[in-house]
Amino acid sequence: MARTKQTARKSTGGKAPRKQLATKAARKSAPATGGVKKPHRYRPGTVALREIRRYQKSTELLIRKLPFQRLVREIAQDFKTDLRFQSSAVMALQEACEAYLVGLFEDTNLCAIHAKRVTIMPKDIQLARRIRGERA
């Protein structure tokens, strides 16, 4: 019989299935608790990374407009009563606030990474603000 060349093939992965013992087969064939399927869960961090990519792509404001407007009016009450705001003024304040917060969180994340952590903590925010010169 002539010898033939063998070509490399991709394996389908895994081992060939083995026959189960009678006791294991009997246990597996019994119905599991009413056939209730567990809901699918992503591994920790997967959804967070997806959200990071999503929000980095987008340009829309992340803080809701009306709650932010109420906050602005509440803070302005301390300085002068009966102040009126143009809608464009509130939008400009919101744009500036969100840009500041995003930058602060970027610096905070760098501080956490520098400390060999992936979780940001209040001390990271304090360090970032101190390095920026915002707080003594």
UniProtKB/Swiss-Prot annotation:
Citrulline modification, residue list: R3, R9, R18, R27
UniProt region (Disordered), positions on chain: 1-43
Modification sites for N6-crotonyllysine: K5, K10, K19, K24, K28, K57
Sequence intervals crossing the membrane: none
Modified residues (Asymmetric dimethylarginine): R3, R18
Chain positions found as N6-glutaryllysine: K15, K19, K24, K28, K57, K80, K116, K123
Known outcome of mutating K37M: Found in pediatric undifferentiated soft tissue sarcoma samples; uncertain significance; somatic mutation; also found in a subset of human papillomavirus-negative head and neck squamous cell carcinomas; uncertain significance; results in global decrease of H3K36me2 and H3K36me3 levels and increased H3K27me3 levels
Disorder noted: Glioma: Gliomas are benign or malignant central nervous system neoplasms derived from glial cells. They comprise astrocytomas and glioblastoma multiforme that are derived from astrocytes, oligodendrogliomas derived from oligodendrocytes and ependymomas derived from ependymocytes.
Protein name (record): Histone H3.1
Species the sequence originates in: Homo sapiens
Name of the gene encoding the protein in the UniProt record: H3C1
